[in-house]
Amino acid sequence: SYKVSGGLLRVGVSVVNALSKKLHLTIHRAGQIHEQEYAHGDPQYPLKVVGETDTSGTTVRFWPSEWTFSQTIFSVDILARRLRELSFLNAGVRIVLRDERVNLEHIYDYEVGLSEKSALDIAGLPGKLADCQEKDPALSELYLVEGDSAGGSAKQGRNRKMQAILPLKGKILNVERARFDKMISSQEVGTLITALGCGIGREEYNPDKLRYHKII
């Protein structure tokens, strides 16, 4: 997690603190509970001991500043997407996202897969996919074409019964060299993964769900 974030406690918190009207820290360490609060980046009192503990860990609570942001309502979809990426990068770490506004909870654990489907899970096929009529993957073909214009020509000349057409941008992400979180956040890569239907990742990938046995 430290490698991914670039050092959350050295960079992330200081930036969040500067952009928050209020930030509250609770630190469980060495048998003591420490607490400190900030307002618009300024400490309201020195770090103080407020109790004893037999656990360790840090809780950070913050309220975005209306001085900086015109919109201070959190998007659960954006948070869910980022936490899902982090769950793939940090095997064995259990991440819980709770939206108390609607009493909703998502749990991410890469070693055991997603415990609950999130709002990111795509219910249907990509909108640009011109699917074929054939339902048997062994008889189905998927053609990847460059751009919408080429996709239009390919759709006109295809065999609708067995040939599906998926237009993609001319130059998508080089997944061989990209970080996993960047790869799965790519719209074009996500579209391709969804169209193929077999998932991605050690726990979610299932080749038996591949929708096309011939990809061109």
From Swiss-Prot:
It is found in: Cytoplasm. It catalyses: ATP-dependent breakage, passage and rejoining of double-stranded DNA. Its EC number is 5.6.2.2. One of its GO terms (cellular component) is cytoplasm. GO terms for biological process: DNA topological change. InterPro entries: HATPase_C_sf (IPR036890), Topo_IIA (IPR001241), Topo_IIA-like_dom_sf (IPR013760), Topo_IIA_B (IPR000565), Topo_IIA_B_C (IPR013759), TopoIIA_CS (IPR018522), TOPRIM_dom (IPR006171). Residues 140-216 form the Toprim domain. Keywords: ATP-binding, Cytoplasm, DNA-binding, Isomerase, Nucleotide-binding, Topoisomerase. GO terms for molecular function: ATP binding; DNA binding; DNA topoisomerase type II (double strand cut, ATP-hydrolyzing) activity. The keyword DNA-binding applies. The record marks K171, N174 as: Interaction with DNA. Pfam families: Toprim. Heterotetramer, composed of two GyrA and two GyrB chains. In the heterotetramer, GyrA contains the active site tyrosine that forms a transient covalent intermediate with DNA, while GyrB binds cofactors and catalyzes ATP hydrolysis. Few gyrases are as efficient as E.coli at forming negative supercoils. Not all organisms have 2 type II topoisomerases; in organisms with a single type II topoisomerase this enzyme also has to decatenate newly replicated chromosomes. A type II topoisomerase that negatively supercoils closed circular double-stranded (ds) DNA in an ATP-dependent manner to modulate DNA topology and maintain chromosomes in an underwound state. Negative supercoiling favors strand separation, and DNA replication, transcription, recombination and repair, all of which involve strand separation. Also able to catalyze the interconversion of other topological isomers of dsDNA rings, including catenanes and knotted rings. Type II topoisomerases break and join 2 DNA strands simultaneously in an ATP-dependent manner. PANTHER family: DNA GYRASE SUBUNIT B, MITOCHONDRIAL (PTHR45866:SF1), DNA GYRASE/TOPOISOMERASE SUBUNIT B (PTHR45866). Belongs to the type II topoisomerase GyrB family. This is DNA gyrase subunit B.
